[in-house]
Amino acid sequence: MSDLTDIQEEITRHEQQLVVARQKLKDAERAVEVYPDDVIKNTLQARQQTVSALEDKLADYKRRMADAVSRKKMDTKPTDPTGIEPDDHLKERSSLRYGNVLDVNAIDIEEPSGQTADWYTIGVYVIGFTIPIILKALYMLSTRGRQTVKENKGTRIRFKDDTSFEDINGIRRPKHLYVSMPTAQSTMKAEELTPGRFRTIVCGLFPTQIQVRNIMSPVMGVIGFSFFVKDWPEKIREFMEKECPFIKPEVKPGTPAQEVEFLKRNRVYFMTRQDVLDKNHVADIDKLIDYAASGDPTSPDDIKSPNAPWVFACAPDRSPPTCIYVAGMAELGAFFSILQDMRNTIMASKTVGTAEEKLKRKSSFYQSYLRRTQSMGIQLDQRIILLYMLEWGKEMVDHFHLGDDMDPELRGLAQSLIDQKVKEISNQEPLKI
């Protein structure tokens, strides 16, 4: 009962504070109409934020009150001596105990599934913000993504920055960037921004800005992404000139040897792939690409572009829609996702534990990337992924960060110094470094 009483007291207190705050807000709005100077406008903004914060807290307390009342009802409900719930259809008790009640009132099955997003609406929404707030939000959801998601799970957060504002009747108000942080039970609307969709759309729209500021997701850093993107134009040019094992050109008698050599190159295979992609466009994604081309975005139009690999710097969970019709781009993202799985498998293999515990440490980035990308309307070309792996797989594995990069000789020397010093100052057994 004390919990319910405490929550009710908090609700009453916040309602009183909200009444006062709303009255102060009305006073400030009237003052702005009479004396529209900066000081009074700033006061108005501060009072708007206070009212918004109090409304959020009050809504949270009311949710907690509803949950507490629901729990209390469940606790006081008389138990059936047979152990069977009154509305259970079983005639005899199951061997399983009763678990949680899953409330599905909030789920709308008419909405598209989580794999489907309205990329045009999402893209137009994001492009409507200033670059600083977009990149800062990207940093919070990629470089510091795990912490941000953990702290805000199950809520709809708002990013705020001084560069993002809108003028309404001469009053400068913050223009918040909204991102939903879903739980496993959440159903997302087609136009709703989630961390995965946000990283996907921003990486596809602003790779040059990401490259200049070196914004990178930790999961990309540990697979050696920094090494991979170094000298990218030269790297991809050399790759394109190499012989492709999947091409067997039909050579007519008298064809010059130089032309025959050219027809066997990876470049020709990529040209063929581009022809296939050009025939499989989706109208909404074409609209997004056209809209982005008229503004600030810097989406790559060729895999040889210097900023092309930076589309994947923040580990989007699928190929960004703005470059999905560029030959080799979606497959490059799949290559990175395989590298993430390879590194996690290596890390799981070197840890101590049972086979089951090791399996839990493995990941399925590739399967997730494949499923999400193909739901956007294209099939990935597995041969291109294989070409990437043959060309760069070995050197990328050699540049994995495996958390134990200390030289064996250095480790041995450091351990001997530790052992010696511990023996000098105590009779305890020295720990291993």
From Swiss-Prot:
Residue ranges of coiled coil: 4-71
Region Viral panhandle binding, residue ranges: 1-175
Record note on domains: The N-terminus is required for chaperone activity and, in trimeric form, this region likely serves in high affinity vRNA panhandle recognition. The N-terminus also contains a coiled coil region, which probably participates in but is insufficient to initiate N trimerization. The YxxL motif is indispensable for the interaction with host MAP1LC3B. The central region is involved in specific RNA-binding. Has distinct cap- and RNA-binding sites so it can bind simultaneously both the vRNA and mRNA cap.
Self-association state and partner proteins as the record states: Homotrimer. Homomultimer. Homomultimerizes and binds to viral genomic RNA to form the nucleocapsid. Interacts with host MAP1LC3B; this interaction participates to the protection of Gn from virus-triggered autophagy. Interacts with host SNAP29; this interaction participates to the protection of glycoprotein N from virus-triggered autophagy. Interacts (via N-terminus) with host RPS19; this interaction probably mediates the loading of the 40S ribosomal subunit on viral capped mRNA during N-mediated translation initiation. Interacts with the viral RdRp. Interacts with host SUMO1 (via N-terminus).
TM stretches of this protein: none
Short motif YxxL, span: 178-181
Stretches for region Chaperone activity: 1-100
Function noted in UniProt: Encapsidates the genome protecting it from nucleases. The encapsidated genomic RNA is termed the nucleocapsid (NC) and serves as template for transcription and replication. The nucleocapsid has a left-handed helical structure. As a trimer, specifically binds and acts as a chaperone to unwind the panhandle structure formed by the viral RNA (vRNA) termini. Involved in the transcription and replication initiation of vRNA by mediating primer annealing. Plays a role in cap snatching by sequestering capped RNAs in P bodies for use by the viral RdRp during transcription initiation.
Region (RdRP binding): 1-50
Region spans: Interaction with host UBE2I/UBC9: 188-191
Protein's name according to its UniProt entry: Nucleoprotein
Biased segments, Basic and acidic residues type: 69-78
Subcellular location, principal: virion
